[in-house]
Amino acid sequence: MMKNLPLIISSIIVGIILFQSALVAPAINRLINAEDASVFLRYIWPKFFLIIAILSLASFVVIAINSYQNLYKYVSIVSFVLMLICYLITPMINDAKDSLNDQLWTALHLSTIILTFITLIINALTIAYWKSVS
């Protein structure tokens, strides 16, 4: 079980990203007025990034303790760092939106989208290739 825990964690990460990005965020923007959506999204996105960062760190620890699959050790730490960056720049995104700095908001928001997409891809690749190295 412990040997495959990083695989399970990557599966959870992929599920969280797909659920949040494909279902929750678009539904919020369509179903809730802009002011309430803003409050909710500012509440949920930092937690989203933090949960994935913690899961990635947990995966890294399990792999490091069991001392196997070095590639996935690096993948999990990259996943952790990318989500930590997203978490840390979220307040800057909110400040840019509040100060009507659309250019900065767009750049920072796009960076979180790209970093989250990279996190999705590397965790999906972990799922796809895990069996071939186990």
What kind of region is each of these model predictions?
Residues 1-59, 91-103:
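Interfacial loop at the N-terminal end of multi-pass membrane proteins
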Residues 52-59, 115-128:
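Hydrophobic cores of alpha-helical transmembrane segments in multi-pass inner/ER membrane proteins
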Residues 67-102:
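Mid-chain, well-packed structural core segment of small domains
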Residues 3-9, 66-75, 129:
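Alpha-helical transmembrane segments and their helix-start/interface "positive-inside/aromatic belt" motifs
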Residues 44, 104-119:
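Individual transmembrane alpha-helices with interfacial aromatic-anchor signatures
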Residues 5, 9-12, 74, 111-118:
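Physicochemical signature of membrane-embedded alpha-helices that form the seven-helix bundle of GPCRs
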Residues 50-74:
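Helix-adjacent hinge/juxtasegments
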